């Protein structure tokens, strides 16, 4: 029998500890009873596996009353109260210490939680302090106590608890930029009318993204196709300006001025999104979708924008000393299709440009139109931010709608934890069902809370087009009913789970067992989807700081190789980072999991230094197109040393310290190093979690 301690750890049930505690209560009351009487009382405690310490203590109080020792029961209650008070004081001191460390610029788990936030800066400090206060309020006043206990133990992780106390706040989204630009919007109480040029439309788009990012806590996605009509508007303007010239001269000048505006606009997009800051102290977590065929009416204009956004990203930006660096944002997604994947196809030149961009800047990420159409009812659309995908949904006219939709949040499951505490595989599946049911109920509660909130909490989202155009003062629920938004059940450590049940994950047998578990989760999630009429879906949790938390939670169990012998656990369904496998095999192995992970999934392959080898990237893209819906290519060759000008991989030790391999520079303010932390690129110089450091340092190249 095991007892669950208050910190979540399991330890063998020790009856003698209880005897000693009860004996102290008797002595405090000057009762001189024999040890046999005390043992008799303790022997009547009903103990089961994984019993909570509080349940044991509740039974002791009742038994002391049943045995007619009310004074001793009172003393025992007082004993519990004193210990609870001491724990509360300790918790309060811990909270105060965390706040003090944040505002004094010290490093802790909170400051290292997000690799894209510089916790040394005032605006980030303020956001982190506010976040810690909101976490405390949410946990004490709002959160389901059973789920909170599971969260604290590390069985699950309730993401973004620093925002959940604010009812109505939502996660990631596909911003309906088309509606806002074509029909106007309102920002900070000021009407922004339809722009009359691409240049103005792009500037407004960046302002919209910053405003939306400040009204939610997840990533935002837009598409270049929504800017494409303004390319035509600008072209028509230049044609009017030069209408009195000869046709040839007019064409030359129109093309010249139009290209200049396209170039300036895409540069504006890049610079604005990297220089503007949302209310949480960071650049908007923005994704830009590059799909040639999104709007066939404006395909020529869309192609021009896609080409230029790649060219601008290849140029990069400059760091403080003038060195060219790779900005972490915006994330780019490029769609591979039948007319751009093979040499000789109509748009293959754009794919070659995308490959060059990947070689130098680690973006874009890639969606296969062929595979996505199989999974998403013939549709092609981007993730919301990093990897969260919507389900197909039709409006009242029977038309598919994706832009203007959103996700309400994620709660993730630590799969290897459930496996390690289970008696066998069937017991594991039962525990998994139980956890999925609890999370589903909580997500339904969150959905209902959001539905009952007034739209004025975020006018740009609900009143002025980003998500909806509801009347001011109405309830959000009008916009998100009938499964309009998604709610995510995350999971991590599928590989460790499979290893625990005696199968090597990277094999065919491991793939089969992994897919069996995935399908089981998928089916159970769909049961709850129907039960609550809520668009619940499985989400491959990326984990940044959570990987450390989940790994630490596994340490209480006997150590098993490939399961709980590291400081991190593997993201979602991925093959472990240290597992030796070639990139093509990795893509083929992981591809089937994305169908079941319908609420969010992305795979990656680790590339060597590919700065001068776009052909290698093009070969990988063909494999992605034929096999996998969504994939990214990682490289470590985008780093820069400001001291000596070195470009390549900056080394990182197991404590997160950085060092230039060329000149030996270790001052993190003189180094620019970035890695794929989860789905987004993260800046190592901002600090990252212990588990993610170990994960990064253990990654093997797949080519």
Describe the function of each predicted region.
Residues 1-105, 694-700:
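Charged, amphipathic alpha-helical regulatory modules used
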Residues 14, 655, 679-680:
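Conformational switch/transducer regions in large eukaryotic molecular machines and scaffolds
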Residues 22, 227-231, 494-498, 674:
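Buried hydrophobic packing segments
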Residues 262-266, 270, 500, 688, ...:
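Metallocofactor- and cofactor-centric catalytic cores in central/energy metabolism, strongly enriched
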Residues 487-500, 519, 676:
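Contiguous, well-ordered alpha-helical segments that form the cores/surfaces of helical PPI scaffolds
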Residues 662-703:
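Long insertion/accessory domains within large nucleic-acid-processing enzymes
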């Amino acid at each position: 029998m095991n007892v669950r301690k208050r910190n979540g750890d399991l330890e063998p049930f020790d009856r003698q500890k209880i005897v000693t505690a009860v004996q102290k209560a008797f002595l405090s009351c000057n009762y001189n009873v024999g040890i046999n009487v005390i043992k008799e009382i303790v022997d009547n405690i009903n103990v089961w596996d994984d019993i909570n310490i509080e349940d044991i203590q509740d039974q002791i109080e009742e038994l002391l009353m049943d045995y007619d020792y009310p004074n001793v029961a009172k003393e025992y209650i007082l004993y519990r109260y004193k210990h609870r008070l001491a724990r509360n004081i300790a918790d309060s001191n811990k909270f105060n210490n965390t706040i003090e460390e944040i505002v004094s610029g010290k490093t802790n788990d909170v400051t290292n939680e997000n690799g894209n936030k510089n916790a040394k800066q005032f605006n980030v400090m303020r956001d982190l302090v506010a976040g810690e206060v909101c976490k405390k309020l949410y946990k004490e006043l709002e959160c389901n106590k059973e789920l909170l206990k599971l969260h604290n133990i590390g069985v699950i992780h309730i993401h973004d608890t620093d925002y959940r106390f604010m009812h109505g706040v939502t996660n990631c989204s596909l911003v309906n930029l088309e509606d806002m630009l074509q029909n106007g919007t309102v920002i900070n109480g000021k009407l922004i009318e339809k722009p009359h040029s691409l240049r103005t439309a792009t500037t407004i788009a960046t302002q919209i993204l910053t405003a939306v990012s400040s009204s939610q806590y997840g990533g935002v996605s837009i598409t270049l196709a929504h800017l494409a009509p303004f390319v035509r508007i600008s072209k028509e303007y230049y044609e009017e300006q030069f209408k009195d010239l000869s046709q040839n001269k007019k064409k030359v000048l129109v093309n010249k001025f139009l290209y200049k505006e396209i170039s300036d606009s895409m540069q504006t997009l890049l610079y604005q999104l990297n220089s503007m800051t949302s209310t949480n102290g960071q650049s908007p977590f923005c994704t830009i979708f590059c799909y040639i065929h999104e709007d066939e009416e404006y395909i020529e204009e869309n192609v021009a924008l896609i080409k230029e956004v790649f060219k601008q990203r290849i140029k990069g930006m400059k760091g403080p000393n003038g060195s060219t660096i790779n900005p972490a944002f915006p994330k780019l997604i490029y769609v591979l299709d039948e007319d751009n994947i093979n040499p000789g196809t109509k748009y293959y030149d754009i794919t070659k440009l995308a490959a060059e961009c990947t070689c130098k800047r680690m973006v874009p990420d890639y969606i296969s139109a062929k595979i996505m159409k199989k999974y998403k009812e013939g549709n092609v659309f981007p993730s919301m931010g990093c990897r969260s995908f919507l389900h197909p949904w039709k409006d009242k006219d029977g038309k598919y709608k994706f832009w203007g939709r959103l996700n309400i949040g994620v709660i993730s499951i630590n799969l290897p934890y459930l496996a390690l505490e289970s008696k066998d595989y069937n017991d594991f599946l039962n525990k998994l069902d139980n956890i999925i049911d609890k999370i589903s109920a909580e997500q339904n509660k969150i959905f209902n809370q959001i539905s009952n909130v007034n739209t004025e909490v975020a006018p740009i989202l609900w009143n002025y087009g980003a998500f909806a155009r509801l009347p001011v003062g109405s309830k959000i629920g009008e916009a998100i009913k009938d499964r309009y938004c998604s709610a995510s059940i995350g999971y991590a450590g599928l590989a460790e789970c499979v290893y625990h049940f005696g199968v090597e994950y990277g094999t065919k047998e491991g793939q089969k067992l992994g897919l069996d578990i995935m399908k089981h989760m998928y089916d159970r999630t769909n049961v709850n989807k129907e039960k609550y009429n809520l668009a619940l879906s499985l989400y491959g949790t990326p984990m940044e700081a959570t990987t450390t938390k989940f790994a630490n939670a596994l340490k209480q169990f006997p150590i098993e190789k490939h399961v709980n012998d590291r400081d991190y656990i593997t993201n979602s369904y991925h093959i472990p980072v240290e597992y030796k496998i070639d990139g093509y095999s990795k893509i083929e192995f992981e591809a089937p999991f994305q169908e079941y992970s319908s609420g969010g999934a992305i795979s990656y392959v680790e590339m060597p230094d590919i700065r001068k080898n776009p052909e290698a990237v093009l070969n990988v893209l063909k494999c992605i197109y034929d096999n996998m819906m969504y994939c990214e290519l990682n490289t470590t060759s985008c780093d820069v040393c400001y001291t000596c000008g070195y470009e390549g991989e900056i080394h990182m030790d197991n404590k997160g310290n950085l060092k230039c391999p060329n000149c030996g520079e270790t001052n993190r303010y003189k180094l620019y190093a970035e890695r794929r932390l989860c789905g987004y690129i993260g800046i190592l110089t901002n600090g990252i979690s212990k588990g993610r450091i170990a994960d990064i340092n253990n990654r093997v190249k797949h080519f």
